[in-house]
Amino acid sequence: MFYPLFSLLIGLSLSQSLYNYQSSNVYNATWMSNLDNGIPIREMSIIGSHSSMGTGTGGWAFKTQSNSLMNQMMIGMRALDIRCRHYRNGFSIHDRFVYLNTDLQGVLDTVRSFLSSYPMETILMHIVEEYDASGNSQSFEDTYLSYQASNSDLIWTPTSQNPVLGEVRGKIVIIQDFPARGIHGLLYTTFTVLPHKYFNTNWDQYDKWTAVKSFLGATNSAGKSRISFWTGHGGSFPYFVASGKSSPGNGDPRLSTALTTPGFKKWYPDFPRVACFIGICTIAFEGINILAYNYLNDQGYTYLGIVFTNFVG
C-alpha cells in the first residue's frame, strides 16, 4: 500500500513552496496520523532535509535550509540528514569542515519535543560520519551507543529491517550510515541510493537532473527501499541546485545558461525557455526541486522513496 504521492506533495505545500529561502509558516505537522499502521516504512514516500542543521552558518556555500529543525518537522519533513563529526567522544554536527553550532543531543532534544506533541508521527534520521575525527578514545559506534542509551525511550530499537508505521510512531528510526559491529536501525546499505553530487560548475545541473529523473522512474518501479539526494555543492551553491536562481531570494530570476533558441533548441530540453523576443528565447536553468515536482505530477508516479533536498518550505 503506497501513500498517494500527489497528496503527500500537496500536503507538504510543495506546490506553493518548491523553493523557499525564507522561514515557512505553512504547517503540516500531523500528516502521518492519517496513515494506516500497517504501511511499511520502506514503502512510504517521505520528504526530508539534506544537511538538516545547515540553517546559515558558513554562508551560502553551507546554507541548505531556511527553516529551523523544529519548523522543518512542523511543515512535514519526516527525514533528517544529520552529519556527525566524532570529536572528543561526542558528535558535533558539521557540514564538511563547518561546525553547525549544535551537537547530536541538541538535535535529539528538538525531535523529542516535536514527537511529544505529535506522537503519531515518526522521524527517520540518517546518521553519517562527517569531517575528521579528533580527540576520541572510543569508536564512532561506541559514541553513538552512548546517545542511544540515554535516549532509549526515543530511538527505535530495531526488531527487523522492515518495520511498519505502527511500530515506530513517536520514535526516531535511525538510518545507519556508519560502520558498526551491531545493527542500530535501518542499514543504509539496504537502500538503493542516488547520492549527493559534487558540482564543478553550474552547468552540471542538467546532469544532476537527468540522474534524478532516471532514478525517480526506477524508484517508482521498485516500490521500496530507495533514497535520493536532490542536492549538490562545490562549484554551485545549494540554493542554485534547488532553485536554478541567480541569487537566493524567492523572487530572484533564474540564471541564464548563456544559450538561446533556435540555435541551441536541442540543448537542455527540460530547462525553461524565457525572455522570448522575435523568435529567440533564452534557455534558463531550473531548480531540481521544481523539475522533479513537475515531472512527478506529469508521470503520475505513486512511490517517491525517501528524498533529501534543500529549501523546501
Where are the language model's segments positioned?
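Cleavable N-terminal signal peptides of Sec/SRP-targeted secreted and luminal proteins
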Residues: 2-15
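Long, acidic (Asp/Glu-rich), low-complexity accessory segments flanking structured domains
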Residues: 15-79, 88-122, 180-189, 233-313
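Short, solvent-exposed polar/charged micro-motifs at secondary-structure junctions
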Residues: 54-56, 134-138, 164-165, 237-239
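Loop/turn elements at helix/coil->beta-strand transitions in domains of secreted/extracellular proteins
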Residues: 75-80, 118-124, 150-153, 168-172, ...
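Short His-Asn-centered micro-motif
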Residues: 82, 126-129, 175-177, 201, ...
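Metal-dependent phosphodiesterase/phospholipase catalytic core, i.e.
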Residues: 85-89, 94-161
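Active-site-adjacent pocket scaffolds in enzyme catalytic domains
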Residues: 141-234
